[in-house]
A protein has these predicted regions:
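Extended acidic low-complexity intrinsically disordered regions
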Residues: 1-16
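Short, surface-exposed, charged amphipathic helix/loop patches that serve as local interaction elements
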Residues: 2, 21-24, 28-133
Length: 133
């Protein structure tokens, strides 16, 4: 008799509430920054079958690449790969600090923890990579 292993099922999207700035014009026609406050922004959950999600995650795990890109670069890569709405994605990419705030938010951190938890090879890594006790 074979056993069927149930896989975890979850929605493919989640939301993060964040504020960000977009370019706009005032009544005199001068360019200003307009704040979009407390927007519920939809993001794709990180998925094993999405190559961009896997590349992004490997970038985060790679010390060299993480240092090279920095938090802003990784945050912007996350927005490019995971923001559901094209217009919102474009707006967010114009506000790097909003990208960082979203990238460091609890819902995003939780999704990365869940995603990394599906990587069997990470579970096999020693707790102390240096080998020292």
């Amino acid at each position: 008799m074979s056993q069927i292993q149930e896989t975890e099922r979850f929605d493919l999207q989640y939301t993060v509430t964040a504020s960000y700035f977009v370019p706009s014009f005032n009544k005199d026609g001068h360019m200003i920054e307009e704040e979009k406050k407390n927007q519920n922004i939809a993001f794709w959950r990180l998925q094993r079958r999405n190559i961009e999600h896997s590349k992004l995650s490997m970038s985060i795990l790679s010390r060299e690449e993480s240092e090279q890109k920095g938090v802003i670069g990784l945050a912007m890569d996350f927005i490019k790969a995971c923001c559901v709405n094209d217009k919102v994605r474009e707006d967010l990419l114009g506000d790097a600090l909003a990208c960082v705030e979203i990238f460091q938010s609890e819902p995003v951190s939780e999704d990365f923890r869940r995603f990394f938890g599906t990587w069997e090879f990470l579970k096999a890594l020693p707790k102390n990579p240096s080998g020292k006790k």
